[in-house]
A protein has these predicted regions:
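Periplasmic c-type cytochrome electron-transfer domains
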Residues: 14-549
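Bacterial N-terminal signal peptides
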Residues: 1-12
Length: 549
């Protein structure tokens, strides 16, 4: 769905031709999207609900404590789902805390470093990582789609199934079948009587919606004939598959503001490009990298740019000005520029666009920018991560329970290398993509991961290839970063300035050969504290008024 929030749509008339004619919701939103939103918000799929319910259509007498409050960087807030059980929205918020100091809108992300899980298991009380924001995560792009910070899921449907039947919903690795049965039970027995069903699907039950033959179903809720199932005769797995498809469709339609041609229009940066008649996206046949180099050449030669100020609009959900001025412009040039034979931080060249390619501001790939090493060394001392013993492929896979993430085949695995560092456990670290690559319990993403690993290294032998995945994490989009703090896969940085300073430190380590498996792009980064304000201002200019209206 094309989300128009906050800023008026005059944006597209600023040097960009006629204003767009948006499709109507009925034309642009498939039925699976609307049904998927309801499923995304449904609180009845978790282990806690299964264990405490009296009837799928009755409220719980006591809610899951995990949703009683929401942890934020500024302290806890009352949970919007208190008295109920966990749902997808419990970690991927949007407008639940709109206008609340220290919280505000989110881009389908949370407010803290790592989210609490409903049921402690395998030593975990929190998720291993920060909740990556979902808006734009399924934006069309070249190359494979790999989801989660470590690429463990090859499709959004796989991600949904893994979530509904996994730890984040309170299910132990040995309880996957029970989780599937709970999803199927809710879908079969739901009668559409709760407020969520009234608001999202006109009070129709899931069984009615999935069958798709009732004349009361409006066109916007009518699932295509090829996808319909009779839940009374379908298998539990078939029901889960359709649930996953609906939620995945909903996820795929979570987009930042765009016009009818898919061009971004919602942020001060987007307005700046348009009013200065700058290219807003690659030309036909032009790669994103080529577009970014061309954009740099143009902005470096731009004379007398027109600045964006309050006359172009105002934020509805943010307390700072809607602006793109000289400081943001300087930050844009630093962001796009790559250093030449960098030996220090003096070139005002961030090389950020090597991974965060405009206009999406992500390459959807995996890189090690030193975040895991910084966290590990903060616990165990400088240089400790460089000396951490990481097993070979044979050693790792032959000792699955010792090293790899828990699964239904290995329910007692310790997940040594998908944990936050701990002073009492010196082997605990998060190695990112290393956990998924060549993992026999994660077969679906292997072809795509191997293609990426072998495309970026000359030596693609199994041990070298595995070594090249150490501490690599998926590149998030930088759009609307203001609404996804705290930042990075571990939520370790609270401000944009803190993130930039971390990259300054890690680029220095990379040039000195002191950053383990460093992304080569870091060596072409040459920035200093002098560049922090401009880069942070530019990143802030990617903010827009996102909501889920």
């Amino acid at each position: 769905m094309l989300i128009a929030c906050g800023m008026a749509l005059f944006l597209t008339s600023c040097g960009a031709g006629d204003a767009p004619s948006f499709k109507s919701e009925a034309e642009s939103t498939p039925a699976e999207d609307s049904i998927g939103e309801r499923l995304f918000l449904d609180t009845r799929f978790s282990q806690y609900f299964a264990a405490h319910m009296t009837d799928v259509n009755q409220s719980l007498t006591a809610g899951d404590p995990v949703v009683a409050q929401v942890d934020t960087m500024h302290g806890p807030l009352p949970g919007p789902f208190a008295g109920q059980a966990i749902n997808c929205r419990s970690c991927h918020f949007v407008t639940e805390f709109q206008g609340v100091t220290g919280a505000g809108n989110r881009t389908y992300s949370d407010y803290t470093t790592r989210s609490p899980i409903p049921r402690p298991m395998n030593g975990f009380t929190l998720t291993p990582r920060n909740a990556m924001h979902m808006v734009g995560s399924l934006q069309p792009h070249t190359g494979p789609t790999l989801l989660h910070f470590d690429g463990e899921f090859a499709t959004p449907e796989d991600l949904v199934k893994g979530t509904l039947t996994g730890r984040n919903f309170g299910w132990a690795p040995t309880e996957a079948q029970q989780a599937i049965e709970q999803v199927a039970l809710v879908i079969r027995k739901d009668n559409g009587s709760d407020q969520l069903a009234q608001d999202r699907t006109n009070g129709l039950s899931y069984s009615t919606l999935f069958k798709g033959t009732d004349p009361k179903i409006t066109s916007d809720l009518l699932i295509p004939a090829a996808d319909r199932i009779d839940v009374n005769t379908a298998s539990d797995q078939q029901i889960l598959d359709l649930v996953a498809k609906c939620i995945s469709t909903y996820m795929g339609d979570l987009l930042f503001q765009q016009d009818e041609l898919g061009r971004y229009i919602g942020s001060p940066y987007d307005v700046f490009l348009r009013i200065n008649h700058l290219p807003v996206q690659p030309n036909a046949g032009e790669t994103p990298a080529q577009y970014n180099r061309r954009l740099l050449q143009i902005v470096e030669g731009l004379k007398n740019p027109i600045w964006v100020d309050g006359s172009y609009g105002a934020f509805q959900y943010h307390p700072f000005p809607f602006q793109f001025g000289a400081t943001e412009f300087a930050g844009l040039k630093i962001f796009l520029k790559a250093a030449t034979s960098a030996t220090d931080g003096s070139q005002h060249a961030g090389n950020c666009a090597a991974c965060h390619l405009a206009p999406n501001f992500t390459d959807m790939l995996f890189h090690n920018t030193g975040v895991a090493q910084a966290e590990y060394d903060s616990v165990h001392g400088a240089g400790a991560f460089m000396n951490l013993t990481v097993p070979s492929l044979a050693d790792r896979n032959n000792n699955f329970d010792l090293y790899l993430p828990a699964s239904s085949s290995h329910p007692n695995a310790s997940e040594t290398f998908r944990r936050a560092p701990d002073a009492s456990h010196p082997n605990y670290a998060d190695l990112g993509l290393w956990n998924a690559y060549l993992n026999p319990d994660m077969p679906n993403p292997q072809t795509s991961i191997k293609a990426l690993v072998c495309a970026t290294t000359q030596d693609c032998s199994v041990d070298q290839g595995l070594g090249n995945t150490i501490a690599q994490f998926r590149t998030p989009t930088l759009r609307d970063l203001e609404d996804s703090s705290p930042y990075l896969h571990n939520g370790s940085r609270a401000t944009l300035e803190d993130v930039v300073r971390l990259y300054i430190a890690n680029s220095q380590l990379a040039r000195q050969g002191l950053l383990r498996n460093a992304a080569p792009e870091l060596r072409n980064m040459s920035i200093s504290d002098e560049d922090v304000p401009a880069l942070a201002a530019f990143l802030l200019s990617l903010t827009e008024d996102y909501d889920d209206a």
